[in-house]
């Protein structure tokens, strides 16, 4: 039996990041995939990033991951979402050439030292005395490992639905992983069923784009990756259209043919990415729904028809597509379909994504009940890092909710579990003002360097930027502007109120009507800082300006983080008997026993937890601590 340090099962977005992280940290790693030609395949939309997802991609890159680099390399359309809003909710999104992305990632994986590829279907896990020891494939060949990461996406008991027809598949054209799903169930894991889907792909030459609204790429765009020096020049537009009353009539009149509404599909659908059937039936008051057409690549006729996802029979799909203005004569190249698959309830995982039931077994991606390439990649990297650290006998890697969107994602999964496909949103991150997309590198590159995933030169570059930001803030805070006719005239020329008392440049920069560049109006003042405004690069200027304009809000969030960390530092003894705590509801007792929170902070985030219940848990912890020290549980009370 061949032996490896780490085995990764599934080479999608989670699997690639897991395998690359483990091998780059020095572990001999084996990456399985059912088909090596579908490594990092974009099964659904041809895009990377989006609201809150862009933050995840930047964080993956800051830790030394690959998704951001591949997105930059293969992008053909760029957008900054929420550009008119504050920096806390701005996110980047790119459309990629789907085939170029797959090939680029495959090339990286193939060339990575210590990373071995093998095309096969893994059927079962090998476990001895509660410790993972390897896997066996469909031919019965065994492969040994000290740690195994499962990143199977929608392949566990996958079932594709098109109208009244359904067949086992991990996605259209690829076989499902049935034996591995059964293996996990036999091992005692609590599992559930979820459903997702994908819209039809249309032939570009059969679409009348003149009847649709064109959207071109944003001219100015920051790359996802720190290592990207320049972006490609080739661009493709997107097009917008809408469904019609005829579209909606076709769906309502034929809803009985939808497996979603006939009761055939049992899996839970994603609330935030509903099928067209759901949109029409649940939002009957809406006269139309948006349709977005996105090219899948530079050298293909395939167009992704976002908004037309459904699971109806092909003949009805054609009628629905043809009911959209501009698509009357369009040809379907690939039909839309729905897919059901098994997932493992993630409350059975530790914060490292290692399972509580089997040591050395890690789960990442859609197997944990999430949706989205970015959520999968973030989990894959997290699991791969921790698998490597465990093999090497090093402390685990965990980021908390104040350190990264990745930390929010993992904590939500293992603390609250999922009852529908989980998608990341900026609203899930309570500290989003300090977890911005623009400061991901400053937050996490030092951590990536400590793990051995970030090279020395990049680490030094980011360290210098951090130093320059601190220096720039100090510089602006130390130079004062005094009220006077000349000074106030300059301010009024820029549409900013006059000053009555001395203010620093940093205080002026807090004003919404002044930017960093506007500070140059005072360059003729004696001793004006020579590095302002041109002595700092654009990234440094942006960080200083955000720190100035949002200083009060940022400070409040940092104070909230201190309070949160105080709760996180209060450990809950392992094996706590929640049934013995008076005042807890049966529901909370079950949730606490199921999640097994490690800290008071984590217990506080369990759905349904109340202040009274949390106080009861803390009293029991204090009692156990006192009992351990041989003291009486409570001090005597004097009358």
Curated annotation (Swiss-Prot):
Main subcellular localisation = cytoplasm
Q: Name one GO cellular component term.
A: cytosol
Supply the InterPro entries for this chain. Answer: FAD/NAD-bd_sf, GIDA_C_N, MnmG, MnmG-rel, MnmG-rel_CS, MnmG_C, MnmG_C_subdom, MnmG_C_subdom_sf
The UniProt record lists the keyword Cytoplasm: yes
- What Gene Ontology terms describe what this protein does at the molecular function level? flavin adenine dinucleotide binding
- The keyword Nucleus appears for this protein: no
| Cofactor(s) in the UniProt record | FAD
* UniProt keyword list: Cytoplasm, FAD, Flavoprotein, NAD, tRNA processing
Q: List ligand-binding residues for FAD.
A: 10-15, 122, 177, 366
Which cellular compartments is it found in? Cytoplasm
Q: What does this protein do?
A: NAD-binding protein involved in the addition of a carboxymethylaminomethyl (cmnm) group at the wobble position (U34) of certain tRNAs, forming tRNA-cmnm(5)s(2)U34.
Subunit structure as annotated in this protein's UniProt entry: Homodimer. Heterotetramer of two MnmE and two MnmG subunits.
- According to its UniProt record, which protein family does this protein belong to? Belongs to the MnmG family.
| Protein name as it appears in the record | tRNA uridine 5-carboxymethylaminomethyl modification enzyme MnmG
Q: Which gene encodes it?
A: mnmG
